[in-house]
Amino acid sequence: MAASASTAAGEEDWVLPSEVEVLESIYLDELQVMKGNGRSPWEIFITLHPATAEVQDSQFVCFTLVLRIPVQYPHEVPQISIRNPRGLSDEQIHKISQALGHVAKEGLGTAMLYELIEKGKEILTDNNIPHGQCVICLYGFQEKEAFTKTPCYHYFHCHCLARYIQHMEQELTTQEQEQERQHVVTKQKAVGVQCPVCREPLVYDLASLKAAPEPQQPMELYQPSAESLRQQEELKLLYQRQQEKGGIIDLEAERNRYFISLQQPPAALEPESAVDVSREPQPPNALSAEQSTSLADQSTLPTSLPMTTQYTYEKTSGAGPNQQRPGETQKSVLDPPRHGRGSWRQYDRRHPKGGECCTPKGTSEIHELPPPEKPLKETVDLKAEPRNKGLTGHPQEKGPGSWQGPSARRTRDCARWERSKNRTPGSCYPHLPRGQGAYRSGTRREPLGLESEEGS
């Protein structure tokens, strides 16, 4: 009971609650108070602006003053901190903190909160010029220059901001026209001109901004120092050394390295093709004589033989009328073009029934093709095997092909052979009656018990 009574008596004697009530009546809603209990300190928040007779457009700097008041106040100095500074440099913020600390130490033991708040306003009023540079032109602000402040406390020269707004309005108009051309429907409403620093929507009067004078900034001529000149010389020598060793890549030369120009200059006329203007016209008789002479010269030139493509085909072992031994490959040259045959007789390519060889039209005898003037290709001449059905003896051995004379066997012509409709691949071979044993021809082995087509 005694402890609680002493605590209540101490709260009644504490000057902080009464001082806070006075501050709330002066600053109204600008002051925010967070009351603590007996162990935690109180906190007071207030946003300070320069004293400009409530003209907000002339207030270019501000900050939020935070005071943490301990339980032993006023016999203990409150903790001072600055938050959310606008238009102030770090150096200025540090100076403001030091100035407020000196005021608090001087008023130790008395009510000092009002003095701290008013000292902060006084410092802001004296430094009502924003520190820093215009983010558009990157020049600092001077006292006699026309500059403006946005609601988000960012600062620009009036002339620079007017140019920025005009540019952004043109960009927005171009985007709207492009969307209308492409028939794009935007669900979100188009946002106006935004702050170039924080992208907050701007509230501006373009006419008044354009009427402001252009900021005059002194043009500073660059004069390199001796150290910078020495570094330039060293870099120049290094560049030359790298260029000599091929370490510098020329982008233009590399780009045109594999460039092929399709534009060629017109070729000059040769003396032979140029028209001789001084030459007199000749009569028609002379022209005809010259033409006949040129034709005679051309007729005396040696005529080259026509080049014919030699087509060859290979025969592999298998069933057929011209079957060969396994592992043996024969090649034959197809008949040459008709214009190279000379005065040869035309042969009928139609094949009679029974598989007889082709014969010339109007004749019943088998003739041998005369040899051409020059063989197109030295290959083995394929001979047609006899197709007589009653042949029972051993077939004659094929001799080497030759163009020197007639062969022991008849030769087929160069015409294409066709198989009759009622013949099978094995019907062109001679057949033995059933039960007469195997038929052997030379070293070739045929299947046993071959039957003829007619008998069964």
Curated annotation (Swiss-Prot):
Residues 364-388, 410-421 have a biased composition (Basic and acidic residues). Zn(2+) 1 binds at residues 134, 137, 157, 160. Residues 269-456 are annotated as: Disordered. InterPro entries: RNF25 (IPR039133), RWD_dom (IPR006575), UBQ-conjugating_enzyme/RWD (IPR016135), Znf_RING (IPR001841), Znf_RING/FYVE/PHD (IPR013083). It is found in: Cytoplasm. This is E3 ubiquitin-protein ligase RNF25. The gene is Rnf25. Zn(2+) 2 binds at residues 152, 154, 195, 198. Interacts with UBE2D2, and may also interact with UBE2E1 and UBE2E3. Interacts with RELA/p65. A zinc finger (RING-type) spans 134-199. Pathway: Protein modification; protein ubiquitination. It comes from Mus musculus.
